A protein has these predicted regions:
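Short, conserved active-site entrance elements at the starts or edges of catalytic domains
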Residues: 1-46
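Conserved catalytic-core subdomain
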Residues: 36-167
Length: 167
């Protein structure tokens, strides 16, 4: 997404523009693309269909902040769960590609999957591997997932205003 662009809007054209890139990634054996900021190409933004969520070694939840990425409801919900249900520190800030190697956990969040674990990021042949691996979520990511899906399924009490009865 570009400054003053439409990356912050959930629009069909935004998804269409990423189709060539994702098809190319799949041909090369990758599941997804990591999009960086267009100005410096040093800051993590999002993938074609999900937002990033990182966890530091001291259990701080970090999400990239940019005016050019989609303000995901799932990401916002996970931030709320992290702070108010799990008592975790949360940082919404610029995340530099150079610091990604230092995170303990990485996931992609969105409506359908809630959170999917990321085990490895490949940057021009350089591999960044996360301790939790690709098959399982890390412990903090798993707690976030279980708490948010528990709220969605009615097993955990929802915050005020999150659920509306439709008759």
């Amino acid at each position: 997404a570009a400054p003053h662009g439409t990356g912050h809007v959930k629009a069909g054209l935004n998804y269409a523009m990423s189709l060539h890139a994702i098809m190319d990634a799949h041909r090369q054996g990758y599941d997804e693309n990591m999009y960086l900021d267009s100005a410096t190409r040093t800051k993590v933004e999002e993938t074609g269909g999900a937002n990033f969520i990182f966890v530091t070694k001291d259990n701080t939840v970090v999400t990239p902040k940019s005016n050019s990425i989609l303000p995901s409801i799932t990401r916002r919900s996970l931030i709320y769960v992290a702070e108010h249900y799990l008592g975790l520190k949360v940082e919404e800030r610029e995340v530099y590609l150079d610091e990604v190697k230092d995170f303990a956990e990485c996931g992609l969040c969105g409506t359908a999957a809630v959170i999917s674990p990321v085990g490895k990021i490949v940057d021009h042949g350089k591999e960044i591997c996360f301790p939790s691996g690709m098959e399982e979520m890390g412990p903090t990511t798993k707690k976030l997932y279980e708490t948010l899906t528990g709220i969605q399924m009615g097993r955990i009490e929802a915050p005020e205003g999150w659920i509306k009865v439709i008759e």
